[in-house]
Amino acid sequence: MNNFANKRKRRIILWLVSVIVIIAVITGAGAIYVNDYYRADSNAITTFATSNTVFTETLDKRTVVYAPEKAKTGFVFYPGGKVEYTAYEPLMKACADKGILCVLIEMPFNLAVLDMNAAEGIMSRYPEIENWYIGGHSLGGSMAASYLSKMLMNLKVLSCSAH
């Protein structure tokens, strides 16, 4: 009996250690995956920032608004998967130069799928905007379209995808 109990105890310990190792490997791989992303080109952002006069407002830690005067059109942008949101800053400033209020949202771990509802509440902050558009690059575009389909709001979708 004692031998049987020892074998059973060893088997349980081996099983538990195996599960812990598998969880650790999966967690480590996930951490490496989400921390390996495309970063913004700081030279492009600096160059564009010096030649741009659009008012920039930070709504919260994750949301930047590029607000031209007297804008009547707004554009909420979801960044592509594993792309640093500031990489889209020159694009947002260029659109704002054309009179469009642009909202750029940083996604958790640079994955829009983790916060599909990031646009929620933004549009109500700007009642002067008559037409709203929502879109994004790649995974961000897909999540913007998913958000729109669930909200059934009077928005237009600009969904950009690259593969």
Describe these PLM feature segments:
Residues G135-A144:
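Gly/Ala-rich beta-loop-alpha elbow adjacent to hydrolase catalytic centers
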Residues T27-T73:
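N-terminal cap/lid segment of alpha/beta-hydrolase-fold proteins
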Residues G81-L91, M107:
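The serine-hydrolase catalytic nucleophile loop
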Residues N2-A24:
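N-terminal Sec-pathway targeting helices
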Residues M107-P108, S159-H163:
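Active-site nucleophile loop of the alpha/beta-hydrolase fold
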Residues M92-A112:
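Conserved alpha/beta-hydrolase
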Residues K72-G80:
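Short beta-strand element of the alpha/beta-hydrolase
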